[in-house]
């Protein structure tokens, strides 16, 4: 399976700064740190942050998934524009309890997004909790209060440095959402009904397009399947 590969977790001073499937994420984070240092050298702002140890560790997918369930927002260290950080925060809210996570940490900026993602499925697909987390790009852009800027939001999604924990894989094309909704409606019309029938139909339908993913379309599909099979999450 695609998820069976090794995952690289990059930490700075203990905080998670990147998760990917190869060590290029370490180079990317190191480059961002070097850029910030060059900016500070050229222009003192009075808000300089001194970073300590940066390290990368190869782990299995189960450990990444465990981190996804355990970490809080303040356990992350994000580098990017304010807009990108807003989008990443909104992605985080798709799978995490906003009320229990506190505010946006200092290194994310102080102009965070307002509101939270509801769990009633009204903007998503219907069906079980996992499938309700799936959302199309235009609806997610609206959650980011930027429906007219779908491309900009999609670009920020693609630059997400912390895969799985910040679940960018849950944003899929509208055609995929429509297909899943059709499957759900058909399942509800049978005498069996229930989420199990709906999930089974979704997992077996290879025609559903879950869209592009920086780590590969096959891996994106497996991550979504994992979401649907882990009902307790």
Per-region residue spans from a language model:
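Short glycine/serine-rich loop segments
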Residues: 146-218, 222
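Basic nucleic-acid-binding alpha-helical/helix-turn surface characteristic of O6-alkylguanine DNA
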Residues: 1-147, 186-193, 199, 203-204, ...
